[in-house]
């Protein structure tokens, strides 16, 4: 039932943000509190969270889900931010997107005393974004217990580039 509700709620925009991309817009989920609540409950029910010490949310839509999940599970929330958004000593990794490239950074102090993370984002496409964060964590001898996303774009094969469990609520 949740999958059907999500498919009816998530909107698709062809050729956005550039020609050839079919953009899946998850923002309408937030306009329906019942669906949003069921989505969060489904996400936090996954085994990957059981041994996690912290939730690592990816800029920017991952923050929307990661913050609620961290709150519900009483776990610290760590933010992976785009360039120029974090102060202090940072670890940064550049990655390729479905439609370009970017980089993400973590504050070194935010992960210093933690070892086991679940990464949360809105969508898994090519895997580049998630891989960049997992490489930062692995370089710091940290463990990624899994990835939790709302949407997975199966044709872009991002799951195959990751060496940890992936939990998707809906697959296109």
Curated annotation (Swiss-Prot):
It holds the Pfam family Pribosyltran. GO terms for biological process: adenine salvage; AMP salvage; purine ribonucleoside salvage. It comes from the Bacteria. It catalyses: AMP + diphosphate = 5-phospho-alpha-D-ribose 1-diphosphate + adenine. Keywords: Cytoplasm, Glycosyltransferase, Purine salvage, Transferase. One of its GO terms (cellular component) is cytoplasm. It is found in: Cytoplasm. Its main location: cytoplasm. Gene3D superfamilies: 3.40.50.2020. GO terms for molecular function: adenine binding; adenine phosphoribosyltransferase activity; AMP binding. Catalyzes a salvage reaction resulting in the formation of AMP, that is energically less costly than de novo synthesis. Belongs to the purine/pyrimidine phosphoribosyltransferase family. PANTHER family: ADENINE PHOSPHORIBOSYLTRANSFERASE. This is Adenine phosphoribosyltransferase. It comes from Prochlorococcus marinus (strain MIT 9301). The gene is apt.
């Amino acid at each position: 039932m949740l999958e059907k509700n999500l498919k009816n709620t998530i909107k698709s925009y062809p050729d956005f943000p550039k020609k050839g991309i079919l953009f899946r817009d998850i923002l309408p989920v937030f306009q329906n509190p019942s669906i949003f609540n069921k989505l969060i409950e489904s996400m936090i029910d996954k085994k990957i969270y059981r041994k996690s010490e912290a939730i690592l949310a990816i800029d920017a839509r991952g923050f929307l889900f990661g913050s609620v999940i961290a709150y519900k599970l009483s776990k610290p929330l760590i933010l992976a931010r785009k360039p120029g958004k974090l102060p202090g000593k940072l670890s940064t990794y550049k990655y390729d997107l479905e439609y370009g490239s970017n980089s993400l950074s973590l504050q070194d102090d935010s992960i210093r005393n933690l070892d086991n993370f679940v990464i949360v984002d809105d969508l898994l496409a090519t895997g580049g974004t998630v891989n960049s964060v997992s490489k930062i964590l692995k370089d710091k001898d940290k463990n990624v217990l899994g990835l939790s996303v709302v949407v997975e774009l199966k044709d872009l094969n991002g799951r195959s580039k990751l060496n940890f469990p992936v939990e998707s609520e809906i697959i296109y």
